[in-house]
Amino acid sequence: MALNLLSSLPAACNFTRLSLPLSSKVNGFVPPITQVQYPMAASTSSIKPVDQTIIRRSADYGPTIWSFDYIQSLDSKYKGESYARQLEKLKEQVSAMLQQDNKVVDLDPLHQLELIDNLHRLGVSYHFEDEIKRTLDRIHNKNTNKSLYARALKFRILRQYGYKTPVKETFSRFMDEKGSFKLSSHSDECKGMLALYEAAYLLVEEESSIFRDAIRFTTAYLKEWVAKHDIDKNDNEYLCTLVKHALELPLHWRMRRLEARWFIDVYESGPDMNPILLELAKVDYNIVQAVHQEDLKYVSRWWKKTGLGEKLNFARDRVVENFFWTVGDIFEPQFGYCRRMSAMVNCLLTSIDDVYDVYGTLDELELFTDAVERWDATTTEQLPYYMKLCFHALYNSVNEMGFIALRDQEVGMIIPYLKKAWADQCKSYLVEAKWYNSGYIPTLQEYMENAWISVTAPVMLLHAYAFTANPITKEALEFLQDSPDIIRISSMIVRLEDDLGTSSDELKRGDVPKSIQCYMHETGVSEDEAREHIRDLIAETWMKMNSARFGNPPYLPDVFIGIAMNLVRMSQCMYLYGDGHGVQENTKDRVLSLFIDPIP
């Protein structure tokens, strides 16, 4: 049974001690229908198609709200050299702050920790990775201010940057003899409790009991504090804003670029605002936005050339939303190639997902799966026209990506790994299509054994490695092909978040039952109880994800580990308020703030 922590955890998280399958094997609703005349092949062994009327589903997604001409018209003055020079001057000033005399750092490590935290939340810490690493190396073993706030902030930042700082030794003075957290009477009580709350989300699976206690303890306090603040209307509006934001979703789970945009506004009105940091954050945000605009325009031109958005009127035409995902995964300007190629992969995944979920018949889907597994452009004559379009767009794009790796790195072995990932993806889609067509409802475990693949994260992450690694190595490709924890656990959370945000809409249009419905069918609980259970699983699996950051082989670059973490954060961002991928209105304001409107 799930622990009854719903009242003490944020909206996006509750917790229970449950297990999800971590093996890598792949193994009745009435939808709206439309009638379409289409040639259909009867089986993979039949080459001659047969004309007949096919009853097809329709999801009625609607056209994109972002026209090609509008995207191509995007422009920014922040591409200019004058802003680049301004940015460099500001970076020099901030770098000097981080490189203060060692005696100052030793005397006041809290000041440096707060500076690092602000740089991270403002979205500019990527400029100062070396300086931050040197500072944390010095601070790591230094005694810190004994307050809960100072201890918790240090713990969170060290864990955030990969230091395995011990939890019990850090917080022992704030625990009773049973190891439970206890209240103190310090003046920074709320500030300290908020810091402890945020720090708890970086705990790992072996620390789950401390996690449960810390979240229960801090959440109850913070909710009571907010309620009292709203009644008394005291002066600490800045702290109250931070607390409410954290209770909605903890910092560790948030999409970094949107968090930066939000925090820039909040920081500007804060009591300790540093004008140099603020100016740096604004200028950098606008310069990076200009880079993202050019990336988006590139992907939009590619998408138009494929013709998939126009020809596949049953599928989601969501080039902007697909690009949004990639910015959540890796926003730094130097990774434009990864963003562009990953957005192309996302567009292909979205179209093919809709082929399996919405439009294709089971016979057609078996043909398409077989074609992808064969990876032979000469054997597609038996496919209907819309599937030929999908296959050749996929085939040409992936082969082009392989060619670029060959040209730039003299590495010619990545295509077999990429095509196998796509074949596994289509096989997992086919499993769900068979479940839907037979009316079968799997157990939650059986569903998850397939669904962590069908959610597309393994394909996305394998491509992301190929787009960022230099050099690309056979050892890494073999390692990733076996679905290590960093991929499998990331995919688990993406799937569960996806199901929380989209399952109701998908069932209405006709789709396989998701994790919520599988658990309801298996246990007989209500939908609310099932959703609470899924939130519990997300919290548990996040702790496994925190563990999976460590212990990876050296041939996996740090940037790839970051993408795997950020993919999870992006899923929580995209599905926090429903289906942000399929329902464009749920994402519109965020797209405007990230890609269209500069910060004044």
Curated annotation (Swiss-Prot):
It holds the Pfam family Terpene_synth. Its main location: plastid. Keywords: Chloroplast, Lyase, Magnesium, Manganese, Metal-binding, Plastid, Transit peptide. Residues 1-40 form a transit peptide. Manganese > magnesium. CDD domains: Terpene_cyclase_plant_C1 (cd00684). It is found in: Plastid, Chloroplast. One of its GO terms (biological process) is diterpenoid biosynthetic process. Mg(2+) 1 binds at residues 353, 357. One of its GO terms (cellular component) is chloroplast. Mg(2+) 3 binds at residues 498, 506. Mg(2+) 2 binds at residues 353, 357. Inhibited by 100 mM KCl. A motif (DDXXD motif) lies at residues 353-357. The keyword Magnesium applies. Optimum pH is 7.0. It is an enzyme of class 4 (lyase). The Asp-Asp-Xaa-Xaa-Asp/Glu (DDXXD/E) motif is important for the catalytic activity, presumably through binding to Mg(2+). Belongs to the terpene synthase family. This is Gamma-terpinene synthase, chloroplastic.
